[in-house]
Amino acid sequence: MMANQGTLLEKGKADSVDTDSLEIDVESLTHMESQLNTDSKTRQFSVTAAINSIKISERTKLRAKIAVSVVLFASLFLFGKVDLSKSIEVALKANPWYLLAAFALFLGSTFLNAYRWKLLASAAGLNQSLLKMVQFCFVGVFFNLFLPSTVGGDFSRCYYLSKGTGKYAHAFYSVLADRTVGIAVLFLFASLGILLGPGGGGLPIQLKLPILLGTVGIFSVLPFLPSLAKRFLGPENWVSRQLNNSPASIYWHDRGLMATAIGLSVILQLIFVLCHVAVGLALGLTNIPLWYYFVFYPSVAVLGFITPSFNGIGIREWAYTYFLTLAGVDRAPALTYAIMWLGLTTMSSLVGGLVYVLGHFKISKAEKDLMESGRMDSLN
């Protein structure tokens, strides 16, 4: 019996030792895990700090954009075989009445654009008069061309709409929705031109494919984006929360609002197509079929929007020349067409400049610095 007790005692000691060892192992593992987490956070912080330390000044960004525009514009003459003297000759023979009509239509489109944006902003809880929204749009056009830093047209629209309200996020989402609806209709127009135009099938596949795929992607994914984000990213994901629980969610819930916005966008883009037709008629380019305007104008607009350049200058001239020569237009009048369109946008920007000065929309240096640093909420 004593032997059995001794055996049990020894077993108990062994179990005690094993338990102690287990506790030591758990503590060691916990310490190791903590150390690994600390090291991971340290490395993550170091990487983040390194990324944040890489800052490109606004002046450098602006110089880079100007350089891109200058190179693209100059390459038209160096490699595009464009005779500048012929382009000037075509410009001097332009019909001024058609150009005046194009300019009037272009200016008038700003009022419709402002009304569309007003509807989207009101849904997000930001109510301004139509006159104010028109002024904000004109000032935005001015900022796009003459102040092409981070304080661009869209930033300025967000700033003026939210000023004094503390609702910069609401303003941002309204501008983003305004942009998105416009781009969606641009893709739709280009696709309809390709599919329904008599010569759409003869266009290069490298032109047709991105337009058609982009249109399918926009109209098949965008309407269901919040639910798709929740399903694939999870409800707690930042993107899911922004789409489902932020002021932006109204644009998926109010289908009547978005149908109205899309309808206004269709009318707006039709006006821009008419502007392009008027410029073509002013230059005597009567051989361009109407359906083709629905293809090349949206394509040029999207390229000018996504390409890093000085307000799209350079890339637009290349694009206009490319698309018009595809339609059988000589290079010289094609370039003249591009320059005429640049002149239209520049004159509209000058009108925006008058609104900016006479409407007392000047931004102080302190406000400009905050906008460029991204601390927009501090402005309200």
Protein language model regions, located:
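Membrane-interface alpha-helices at helix entry/exit sites of multi-pass transporters
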Residues: 130-135, 149, 153-154, 164-179, ...
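Predominantly cytoplasmic-facing regulatory/coupling regions of multi-pass membrane proteins
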Residues: 2-138, 196-305, 333-338, 343-380
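Transmembrane alpha-helix interface/packing and boundary motifs in multi-pass membrane proteins
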Residues: 141-149, 298-317
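Hydrophobic alpha-helical membrane segments of integral membrane proteins
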Residues: 156-160, 172-175, 185-187, 310
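Hydrophobic alpha-helical transmembrane segments in multi-pass integral membrane proteins
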Residues: 308-310, 321-342
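Re-entrant/interfacial helical elements at transmembrane boundaries that shape
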Residues: 153-162, 309-326
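Hydrophobic alpha-helical transmembrane segments of ABC transporter permease domains
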Residues: 176-196
